[in-house]
């Protein structure tokens, strides 16, 4: 019996080391050989599953699908607005500091320390998934989450359901691919550029609602630049489960307030806010903060009545 236990331990350790080695290898490949190294990995990946490639993908942090507006002959009156994803892209300077801090606190507290992959997060996810045998855990850095979102957008634009499936599936292969690309991204873009990209690409509610500018308008009738602490924490809390935590749905509001307060707790723990700011914010009923703009949630075509025709 002791011998069998020892063997199991060695196997678990070997699996753990293999997993971490692959993560680190991605970093070494990217930092030393960069594109040639990634291409060599990519050729192996594509031979197994073609849609799991890591090359030839545009990750421009500003090139995201936005709304298109149809104007009347006067060039000013908006007749209709068309979109696949309800999003308005804004630069980081037009996103409040509270919103930036809330997002980092919620999604990746070591964002400004790692190089694209949060090794501690990966180790925690490994233990939960492979040793404790729980569901596949996250462990993804904010950069990796940005990569995942862009891969899904790219697949939809290309009308490629296979690539879209692989971009979202809960597998180690997908995680490793995201790690490789995330490390590449952090060589090309600054942390602030990546944070800007994520704040514009992430889903912040049901009804195809993406990006903090649209979320600010939808929930509070304001702009991303003017979001206060409570509003920012509310929006940051949504990304974990956009349908369940969407505060515009009345039955979601108790859970939405709970999730908002979790974000506020994290912001306090990470020294983004003071104890007084935290205490004042967590006692604020979420319903009293909302100013829902229902027209912002229209999906696919936001039209000006009969004028659209």
Regions found by a protein language model. Name each.
Residues 48-49, 156-167, 295-309:
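Charged, glycine/proline-rich intrinsically disordered loops and linkers
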Residues 275-309:
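Non-catalytic structural connector segments
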Residues 1-69, 77-78:
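N-terminal type II signal-anchor transmembrane helix
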Residues 64-274:
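Peptidoglycan glycan-strand catalytic modules in the bacterial/periplasmic cell-wall system
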């Amino acid at each position: 019996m002791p011998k069998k236990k020892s063997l199991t331990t060695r196997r678990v350790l070997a699996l753990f080391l293999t997993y971490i080695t692959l993560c680190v290898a991605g970093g070494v490949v990217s930092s030393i050989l960069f594109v040639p190294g990634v291409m060599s990995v990519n050729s192996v990946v594509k031979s197994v599953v073609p849609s799991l490639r890591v090359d030839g993908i545009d990750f421009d942090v500003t090139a995201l699908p936005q709304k298109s507006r149809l104007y009347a002959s006067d060039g000013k009156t908006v007749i209709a607005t068309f979109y696949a994803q309800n999003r308005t892209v804004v630069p980081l300077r037009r996103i409040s500091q509270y919103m930036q801090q809330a997002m980092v606190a919620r999604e990746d507290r070591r964002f400004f320390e790692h190089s694209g992959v949060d090794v501690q997060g990966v180790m925690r996810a490994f233990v939960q998934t492979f040793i404790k045998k729980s569901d596949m855990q996250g462990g993804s850095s904010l950069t990796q989450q940005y990569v995942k979102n862009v891969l899904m957008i790219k697949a939809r634009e290309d009308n490629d359901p296979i690539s879209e499936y692989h971009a979202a599936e809960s597998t180690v292969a997908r995680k490793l691919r995201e790690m490789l690309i995330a490390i590449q991204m952090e060589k090309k873009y600054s942390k602030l550029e990546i944070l800007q990209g994520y704040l514009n690409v992430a889903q912040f509610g049901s009804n195809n609602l993406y990006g903090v500018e649209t979320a600010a308008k939808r929930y509070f009738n304001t702009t991303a630049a003017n979001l206060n602490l409570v509003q920012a924490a509310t929006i940051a809390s949504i990304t974990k489960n956009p349908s369940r935590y969407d505060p515009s749905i009345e039955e979601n509001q108790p859970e939405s307030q709970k999730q908002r307060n979790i974000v506020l707790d994290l912001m306090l723990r990470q020294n983004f806010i003071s104890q007084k700011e935290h205490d004042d914010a967590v006692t604020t009923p979420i319903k009293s903060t909302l100013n829902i703009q229902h027209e912002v949630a229209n999906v696919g075509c936001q039209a000006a009545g009969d004028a659209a025709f």
